[in-house]
């Protein structure tokens, strides 16, 4: 049994509608206890729509911004939404002692994701190693082991905060800090977190021929 998690505001509801409908159409709901949706700026009509789905639980956040932006401007609105993802994922993991799957709200479920999850790993990260840089992307993340998942989140969040100090103008912090965190943990002889891969060819459209 798993819980699911995503972040959504009104500007992304065009994607959120596809996300939730495709989830209910193409994924085995018997394997899902709760679908947690972090509200970073949903309108009343958005909330009303999402609450029609029986497994959905809305989580209030400390952000109420219905718009979005690109990643680069100072005080980027988009970035404010993204930075809540790891923070509240960790809170949900602590709250409900079940494995947790995070899928970005601008994704669409085309088949059952659970057949691609390696249960032997403590955490699973989305591997796109065909890229020349940043072999892992933060759009799909799984914590199978709650305690070690929280430890991984702690390391990831700490690395992200450090990256924001080191390179404040880069804009995209989430995936790059994830890559730095993974490399550091894999090179740490004291690390006890087993990190596995979920490949983009199975959970993302980047390698699918349409």
Regions found by a protein language model. Give the residues of each.
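A structural signal for short, well-ordered beta-strand segments and their strand-loop junctions
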Residues: 36-37, 101-104, 125, 191-198
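Short, surface-exposed amphipathic charged segments that create phosphate/polyanion-binding patches used
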Residues: 70-80, 137-140
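Catalytic core and acceptor-binding pocket of nucleotide-sugar-dependent glycosyltransferases
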Residues: 149-210
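Amphipathic alpha-helical segments that form well-ordered structural scaffolds
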Residues: 18, 22, 49, 88, ...
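A conditional alpha-helix N-cap/helix-loop micro-motif detector
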Residues: 13-16, 79-82, 171
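N-terminal anchoring/stem segment of glycosyltransferases
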Residues: 1-73, 94-97, 145-147
């Amino acid at each position: 049994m798993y819980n699911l998690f995503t972040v959504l505001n009104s500007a992304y509801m065009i994607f959120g509608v596809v996300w939730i409908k495709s989830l209910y159409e193409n994924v085995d709901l018997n394997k899902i206890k709760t679908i947690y949706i972090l509200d970073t700026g949903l309108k009343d009509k958005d909330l009303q729509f999402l609450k029609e789905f029986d497994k959905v639980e809305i989580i209030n956040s400390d952000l109420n911004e219905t718009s979005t932006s690109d990643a680069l401007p100072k005080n980027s609105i988009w970035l404010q939404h993204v930075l809540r993802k790891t923070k509240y994922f960790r809170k949900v993991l602590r709250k409900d002692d079940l494995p947790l799957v995070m899928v970005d709200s601008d994704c669409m479920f085309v088949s059952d994701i659970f057949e691609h999850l390696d249960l032997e790993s403590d955490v699973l990260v989305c591997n796109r190693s065909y890229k020349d840089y940043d072999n892992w992307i933060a759009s799909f993340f799984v914590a199978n082991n709650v305690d070690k998942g929280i430890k991984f989140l702690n390391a990831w969040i700490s690395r992200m905060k450090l990256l924001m100090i080191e390179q404040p103008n880069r804009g995209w912090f989430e995936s790059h800090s994830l890559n730095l965190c993974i490399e550091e943990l894999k090179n740490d002889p004291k690390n006890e977190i087993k990190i596995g891969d979920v490949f983009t060819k199975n959970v993302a459209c980047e390698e699918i021929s349409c």
